Amino acid sequence: MATTRLNPSCHFPASTRLSCESYLGLRTTGRISYARTLTAPRGYLAVKANGGQASVVTAAAITEKQQKKYPGESKGFVEEMRFVAMRLHTKDQAREGEKESRSPEEGPVAKWEPTVEGYLHFLVDSKLVYDTLEGIIDGSNFPTYAGFKNTGLERAESLRKDLEWFKEQGYEIPEPMAPGKTYSEYLKDLAENDPQAFICHFYNIYFAHSAGGQMIGTKVSKKILDNKELEFYKWDGQLSQLLQNVRQKLNKVAEWWTREEKSHCLEETEKSFKFSGEILRLILS
C-alpha cells in the first residue's frame, strides 16, 4: 500500500496528548503520519483502512532518521546553543572562536584602556537589560518563561547595589544610553512575539556573563577599581550548579520545539552578540 507523509504547519498543544479516539471517523485508503519533529519525543499517528472500517494505531515505536545532525545535538539543545555562540567569538576571546578581532573590545582584555565613566555606562545599560529580562520572566504566566523564575542567575539587584556603591564614592550615575534602551525594547518585542528567539537571548545573556563577563569584570576592576569585586560578579550558591539547573530547564523546554523552531533560536545568536557587544563597547567610551 502506498504511503503518504504529511507535514502539517499547525502545532498541537504541548500540554495535551493527541487522542486517537477523535480520529476514528476518518476514512482513507492510504497511510497518514505526522512528522515526529512536531511533538518530539512522541510518536505519530497512523491511520489506515481495514476492510472498509477506519482504525487508528499509535505508532510510537516508529522513528524517522534525521536527515541532518546538528553540532552538539546529541547532548541537548543547550550544547547546540553553546556551539553556535562559541563560533561567534573572536580568536582572541576563545579557542573555538572563528572571527578576527575588528575593534578594541573584541581583542584581549589586557590591552583595554577602560575608564570609570565608561564602566558606569556599561553597568547602567546592563542593569536596564537585566531589569527588562527579569521583569518579563517574573510577570509572565507563559509556561516557557515561568519556569525560569528565581534561577539564582538574576543580576538586576546586584547591579543596583553596585551603582549605589559608586554613588557613595561620589560618582554621578548616568542615564541609560541607546545600546541598553534599544536592546531592552527588542527583548520586550521578542517576549511577546517570538519565544524561541527570546530564549536565545536569555541563554546568551546569563551564560556569557557567567563566563567571559566574569573574566572581564575581574580584569577591568584590577585596572580602574583597585581590585574591587562588584556584586555583579557574585552569586549566592555554587555558580556551576545554578547554571546546570538552567541548562536542564532549557533542554526540557526545547524538547517540545520542532527542528525549525530550534534552528530559528540558533539563528538569533548573532543578534544577541551584536546587542551585547554594543553595550560592552561602552566600557571603552
From Swiss-Prot:
It catalyses: heme b + 3 reduced [NADPH--hemoprotein reductase] + 3 O2 = biliverdin IXalpha + CO + Fe(2+) + 3 oxidized [NADPH--hemoprotein reductase] + 3 H2O + H(+). It comes from Arabidopsis thaliana (Mouse-ear cress). Widely expressed at low levels. It is found in: Plastid, Chloroplast. One of its GO terms (cellular component) is chloroplast. This is Heme oxygenase 3, chloroplastic. CDD domains: HemeO. Keywords: Chloroplast, Heme, Iron, Metal-binding, Oxidoreductase, Photosynthesis, Plastid, Transit peptide.
